[in-house]
Design a protein with these regions (language model features):
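Membrane-interface helix/loop caps of multi-pass membrane proteins
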Residues: 2-378
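Extracellular/periplasmic envelope-modification machinery, especially enzymes
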Residues: 253, 316-320, 324-327, 334-335, ...
């Protein structure tokens, strides 16, 4: 929600406006606690900020004062930054204490972004879901996106209004009418952009451009206010209706936001701002002392309530607030906000020594320096810890490579003790203990184990666990496949060698690509890959989205026009809410691919859940071949017969990797001292690299 900033101008004090802020703050609290009503607080607070700022600016300009952009900026941010900085510092400290280590870097990034007013753009960049129901997984600083948006407008609006005033005076125009005209145009242009912009990712909620029209509408109405006078009785009647509309939106979910529907509560808010001074029932309700008191501290309430909500849910390991604890946390939030207002906000805002432009600038500079220095010191600590974890992981990969090079460790279960030359009556020599970080090799090793140290990778190195390749794919592949956004098109090896093609989503990238590259390096193949996040390779399926369906169709077209020797793909699809199934139309897809002359190598998908498997595993201590959190295989994977329809297709070879994910009916999250998953469903690069030698040997066996 946008922060309910108190008017920074000397305007006639109106208790009803403070009461209006309180109503909107209650809407924010109820929505954040229980998703009650429509998220209109963001829109209504924008209206109040723009309306009051513009009203004051026009009054000063009409009185002959020269607009001072610097004074406006320093007045605004002197008031906003100190409470914000304290909130960020305390929240970051509490987050380090309560949140999993893998989330610490995100908190540091958001702390920097919040203090420098671009948090909304950061959240849009990482595709944050504002309406996610599991608040425990939300960032404790997520709510400050709105403060960033307002901060951007508080920088832009004074400069824009000052420029309009200067030009209006030079052209002999009315300042009020010029400002009205400018903001009417901005309102129209911004609304047109909002209505015509596609938002498949849902990140438009954090986009400043999506709410410029709301700022502009508030400014336009403020400029037009003198022409909107009504008789006292009519003004009071309009205020009552407006308050009723606002309360309705506070209690009932109506429309989508941001969107044109926001115009209704915005106009209701405008009516209360315009006509509330006429008194009457609406003004009387809004001037009720408890509401006025809440309105006076609404900025601080907004700052502190969300971190309190989220960190409480993390501490008690719950996804949502109940009625009792929700109300209790609201009371706590109000109490903390009252302290923050009394000892930080009010003194800085009201003491005479803090009101010169120089002093205001010094307060802003000192506050920013203290806040950014605090966050930077934590960042340095994370860098040091991350570097230590990275070096530890690199050492583990060296021991893993040594283990993988020994055939007895790679796939000893594949050896048939009853085969020719082996006497089943003679007990085999005992195998040496498996040590170090063998990863997947431990899942198939029948001997003893002697693991020491923590499982890898560490929580601060998970960003390095995504498989990345630098090689470019061929020109024909690029021409067809790169027309689809966020498609990875990679090439590895000598293009004149026999060719392997890997297609699929990030699951294929994490599991199949390490094996394909190892096979290329050892046996002299050229590997080409077309990988698209969130888009498993299957028959083109409209349900997967136009872009994904187009990508998959382009892959098949490419293979038909540029035949390859081998194609690697994942032929099943797991689900967090059901049992594994064959990929959509995968039988027809394999038939189409083999018709090009390619041999198809298929494996099954890895585990997919609603639980952060890394965090779950990190709380356990592995001391056998597998450990961490143990999941029940039948809950996620189908029986082995799921592959039967594909086995009848000439040119298809199934490579079984299920024993690298599960042992019997138990699926661990740590194997051979290596974390298998980095989140809810992606295999770590480290584990994928330990799988690669085993998969390569099995591919060779399948092709014999």
């Amino acid at each position: 929600m946008v922060v309910p900033v108190v008017a920074l101008q000397k305007t006639p004090h109106r208790n009803d406006i403070q009461g209006l802020r309180a109503v909107l703050m209650l809407q924010v609290l109820f929505f954040h606690a229980w998703f009650v009503g429509s998220p209109i607080g963001v829109d209504a607070f924008i209206m109040i900020s723009a309306f009051l700022m513009t009203s004051s600016f026009i009054r000063r300009s009409e009185a002959g004062a020269t607009p001072s952009v610097l004074e406006r900026w320093t007045t605004t941010f002197k008031r906003l930054l100190p409470p914000l900085t304290i909130t960020v510092a305390v929240t970051l400290t509490a987050s380090i204490a309560l949140l999993p280590a893998r989330r610490w870097q995100d908190m540091v990034d958001q702390s920097f972004a919040s203090l420098t007013y671009w948090q909304n753009w950061l959240l849009a960049h990482v595709s944050t879901d504002y309406f996610a129901e599991d608040h425990a997984l939300a960032s404790p600083l997520q709510h400050l996106w709105s403060m960033s948006m307002q901060g951007q407008m508080f920088l832009l609006w004074p400069a824009l209004m000052a420029l309009t005033v200067v030009l209006a005076r030079k052209m002999g125009l009315s300042v009020r009418r010029a400002i009205f005209g400018v903001f009417v145009v901005i309102t129209a242009l911004s609304l047109i952009w909002l209505v015509t912009t596609s938002d498949p990712s849902g990140t438009i909620y954090f986009d400043t451009r999506a709410r410029i029209w709301e700022f502009a509408l508030g400014s336009a109405i403020a400029a037009f206010a003198p022409y909107l006078r009504l008789p006292t009785l009519a003004a009071r009647a309009v205020s009552v209706v407006a308050l009723g509309v606002l309360v309705l939106f506070c209690l009932v979910s109506i429309g989508t936001y941001p969107g044109p529907m926001a115009a209704v509560p915005l106009l209701a808010t405008s009516a209360l701002l315009l006509f509330g001074a006429a008194g009457g029932p609406a003004a009387g309700v809004l001037s009720w002392r408890p509401l006025v008191m809440l309105g006076n501290i609404s900025y601080s309430v907004y700052l502190v309530h969300w971190p309190i909500f989220v960190l409480y849910l993390v501490a008690v390991d719950r996804e949502a607030l109940g009625v009792v604890d929700g109300i209790a946390l609201m009371v706590v939030s109000v109490a903390v906000a009252a302290v923050l207002t009394k000892y930080v906000d009010s003194p800085i805002r009201s003491l005479p020594w803090a009101n010169t432009t120089l002093r205001k600038t010094q307060i802003i500079g000192l506050t920013l320096w203290l806040g950014l220095t605090f966050v930077f010191n934590i960042q340095v600590g994370l860098w040091k810890t991350s570097d230590a974890q990275f070096r530890y992981a690199e050492d583990s990969r060296a021991t893993s490579d040594q283990v993988s090079a020994q055939p007895a460790f790679v796939d000893v279960l594949a050896v048939d003790n009853a085969s020719e030359g082996v006497d089943p009556e003679v007990e085999p020599a005992p195998l040496p203990p498996l040590t170090g970080f063998p990863g997947a090799a431990a899942m198939v090793y029948p001997g003893p184990f002697a693991f020491e140290g923590e499982a890898v990778p560490g929580p601060l190195t998970l960003d390095n666990e995504w498989v990345m390749y630098e090689g470019k794919c061929s020109d024909p592949a690029r021409a067809l496949l790169l027309q689809h956004a966020k498609t990875g098109c990679h090439g590895h090896g000598d293009p004149t060698n026999p060719r392997i093609f890997v297609g699929g989503s990030s699951h294929a990238e994490q599991v199949l690509m390490p094996a394909a590259r190892l096979l290329a390096d050892q046996d002299g193949y050229y590997v080409e890959a077309a990988l698209k996040a969130g888009c498993p390779w299957s028959a083109p399926d409209p349900a997967s989205g136009e872009d994904c369906a187009g990508h998959n169709a382009a892959i098949l077209q490419y293979l038909q026009e540029n035949p390859v020797d081998y194609v690697f793909l994942i032929v099943t699809a797991t689900s967090a809410n059901g049992v594994e199934q064959l990929g959509h139309g995968v039988v027809e897809l394999v038939e189409d691919v083999t018709a090009t002359g390619a041999t198809v190598i298929g494996i099954r998908d890895n585990l997919r859940t609603n639980t952060d498997l890394y965090q779950c595993a990190a709380s356990q201590t592995p001391d056998t071949s597998y450990g961490g959190c143990l999941l029940n295989r039948p809950d996620y994977f189908a029986s082995d017969s799921i592959i039967d329809p594909l086995l009848e297709i000439p040119g298809f070879h199934y490579v079984n990797v299920m024993d690298l994910y599960c042992s019997g009916d138990v699926c661990p999250t740590i194997a051979g001292n290596v974390q298998i998953y980095l989140d809810t469903n992606h295999v770590t690069q480290t584990y994928g690299q330990t799988m690669a030698p085993i998969i390569v040997d099995r591919i060779r066996d399948a092709l014999k």
